[in-house]
Amino acid sequence: MYAVVKTGGKQYKVAAGEKLKVEQIPADIGAEITLDQVLAVGAGDQIKFGTPLVSGASVKATVISQGRHDKVKIFKMRRRKHYQKRQGHRQNYTELRIEAIVA
């Protein structure tokens, strides 16, 4: 069984037992959270799509860790004008383990 969930402005296809890195969720390590925005649920040939959400469906997950992704380097330059601008960015993430899909 799998589900398509929306969190942090992105959509993820998940199944029970998988690990998943999502945008940061303010929760303690080891806490169990519920993802309520389920867009689709499927098992084998049967797929149930929501309009826009599947009513009564949710995904239970446990927070494994909180961290930061690798640095992304931004470099802007204007040729022949001696203009250079450097910037770096590290995005925070939350790693989840999907425990169960309730449909």
Curated annotation (Swiss-Prot):
Keywords: Ribonucleoprotein, Ribosomal protein, RNA-binding, rRNA-binding. It holds the Pfam family Ribosomal_L21p. InterPro entries: bL21-like, bL21-like_sf, Ribosomal_bL21, Ribosomal_bL21_CS. GO terms for cellular component: cytoplasm; ribonucleoprotein complex; ribosome. GO terms for biological process: translation. The keyword RNA-binding applies. Coiled coil: none annotated. SUPFAM superfamilies: L21p-like. This protein binds to 23S rRNA in the presence of protein L20. Belongs to the bacterial ribosomal protein bL21 family. Part of the 50S ribosomal subunit. Contacts protein L20. NCBIfam families: L21. This is Large ribosomal subunit protein bL21. The gene is rplU.
